[in-house]
């Protein structure tokens, strides 16, 4: 029983180390070039990348209240910016 448990734990540890090493090699094989846009930032929809502060950015027009900018549709407010969840 103890030998089986030790064998399973050893295999799990080897698998974790192998996966970590494979991820590091993959990251090293794809170096970022200077001026190359970050893939996460390039994928962000420009219309969604706006400040989501508590105060209104749009001034009141007549009797209408201004609308607060909110993040929606799988986006959340983090550090006053809308980011994909």
Curated annotation (Swiss-Prot):
The keyword Endoplasmic reticulum does not apply. The keyword Disulfide bond applies. It comes from the Eukaryota. Residues 23-48 form a propeptide. Residues 1-22 form the signal peptide. Neurotoxin active on both insects and mammals. Belongs to the neurotoxin 12 (Hwtx-2) family. 02 (Hwtx-2) subfamily. This is U4-theraphotoxin-Hhn1a. It comes from Cyriopagopus hainanus (Chinese bird spider).
